[in-house]
Amino acid sequence: MIEAITTRRSIRKYKDKPVPKDVITEILQAGILAPSSKNRQPWKFIVAEGDAKAAACQAMENGLKREKQMPFIPESSPYINGAEHTLQIMRQVPVLIFIVNPLASSFSKALSMDERVSEICNSQSIGAAIENMTLE
């Protein structure tokens, strides 16, 4: 395990060939097996290829344009350039795996201390799933 952790690296140059379904399944299984706070498993995995991937990238581009023109979250402005760079990378990959938290609260909802702690724990659980997936 230490070898996998110490030799892990981010790849940002991709081959123009599809990822075999069994590889995608193994990556998803690694995420599913991650530990989660109170075993809530606060994740849904969405695999996007082809037209679905193109549509997801287009939706992100549209959202970034809207955010630049009229910020929904004004504090996000410094991060737009980074998100645009991420979008360029997303367009190059053969498959995208989105991880969403179906238990998350609305951005506009005021949270109690317990709800805030739960949100933090869910985010950490999703982080564990992502790490498992990248080590796979």
Q: Where are each of the predicted segments found?
A:
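Specificity-determining recognition surfaces
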Residues: 1-24
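A generic alpha-helix structural signal
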Residues: 24-28, 57-60
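Glycine-rich phosphate/pyrophosphate-binding beta-alpha loops
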Residues: 35-39
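Glycine/small-residue-rich phosphate/adenosyl-binding loop
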Residues: 46-126
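Short, intrinsically disordered, charge-balanced linker/junction segments flanking boundaries
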Residues: 129, 133-136
